[in-house]
Amino acid sequence: MQVLSSDDLGFLKSVILEAGGMARRIQQGDFHPERKEDSSLVTLADLEVQRYLVERISGRFPGIGFIHEEAFDKNSAELKTNSLTAVIDPIDGTAVYSMMLPTWSISLGIFRGTRPLYGFVYSPGCGMLFHNDDENAYLNDRILKVDRNMRVDSETNVFIPGELFSSMHIRYRGKVRNFGSTALHACLVADNRRNRALAFYGQAYIWDWAGAYPVILKAGGQVRYLDGGEVDFAEALRNGCQLTGYAAAYSKDDFDYVRSIIEIIR
């Protein structure tokens, strides 16, 4: 069932593109990252992009709910039944953003109840806009369909978050990479015919996954926990908005192989 019209989706695409331009202008200027209570970084771009997205989206969709990373009480997060919620990560990859590197992204997911329906992940520095509608996933308006029977060799890529490098065993002969953005890593899996991406492994928060999750599914990829369980966003809400374990976004049909690649040892 169609929830948003093509005009609505076009509006959201234009808004995230505008937000990306704003973030790039701030990055190219003189800014100074600050530390949050958990010691993670926050920049002016995180705050300004989030403010802009909330303002524009609430103007288009009166009554829509919001879950976002900055200045947000995780204990107040709700995904109301049959209601729309915009889940926002204004700068996914603030650390690489603050290093003046290009591999950060802006992530926006539109949920109905606890189900993520539409995703938008924009990497201005890489020139990549991933999104989906009710039929397909797209990269820069080109339809994406994963190759579920992809060949795995020394040039195949998997993406792993930095915190896992010291707490895992890996059994894999290809490339292991980290670009600094959960949403971008996950969306790259949807483009595996071109970039040879097999999987992204990560935990993170709802806002890190919200934009990428529906894109991956519409491209024909899959997301599940490493123990085989389905990702339950209502359960993640009850866990302080964090996924309850490590999940894999993957493009190959053989999940047993995908999860055999890494063993978390901590």
What positions do the PLM features span?
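A structural micro-motif at secondary-structure boundaries
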Residues: L139-V146
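Residue-level signal for inorganic ion chemistry
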Residues: A19, A23, D46, I57, ...
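An extended, acidic
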Residues: R148-R266
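Conserved residues at the C-terminal ends of beta-strands
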Residues: E69, Y122, F200
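DPxDG-like acidic metal-binding loop motif
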Residues: L79-Y138
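N-terminal subdomain of lithium-sensitive/metallo-dependent phosphomonoesterases centered on the IMPase/IPPase/PAP
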Residues: M1-I91
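Generic detector of well-ordered alpha-helical packing
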Residues: L47, E70, P90-G93, P124, ...
